[in-house]
Amino acid sequence: MYVLQLKALGVDQIARFDFMPPAPPAAHVADALAHLESLRALDEEGRLTQLGERMAEAPLSPMMARAILHDASCADEMLTIAAMTSVGSPFDGSESVAAQIERRQFVAEEGDHLTLLNVYEAFQRAGASSRWAAQHGLSYATLKRARSIRAQLVAFVTRQWSWPWRRAGDEQAVRRCLAAGFFRQAVRYDGS
């Protein structure tokens, strides 16, 4: 994130930048630059792209910003996922069998991001009720905070990026957005 911000501030030679001690290892800086290039935030010469400029504006990690910017039709879902990942686990830590059974309904086999989306959407459908959250083994305080962060992100995207606001309602499209930003964290089950 800091390397992208430095690029946005016009620092061209990140490797030669005078970081405050302790400076990050050169290998970490090189890896960050390569990652930003793979996200298309930087071009082959290490210059900030238009996409990179937009990513740098966002109060998000470069990966999440890239995922959101991948497709405007998924902005609604992606902003929910961004908010939910920023607040920690919505599960209240209850180990009771009843709570575990209630939580299973939200689990998406495609991964944690879609599970978090399911939790938030169910919370919204239930009227953002504290009682509903408690009945489902969820932390009302965490969900309320995610709701507030999401509202801030919606305001940012609407104001700063002037995007057409849409909801895909298409899990495949959401997964493509996630892959655009988080491809480095993807794994493939090998059957073992």
What are these regions (language model features)?
Residues M1-S192:
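Second RecA-like catalytic domain
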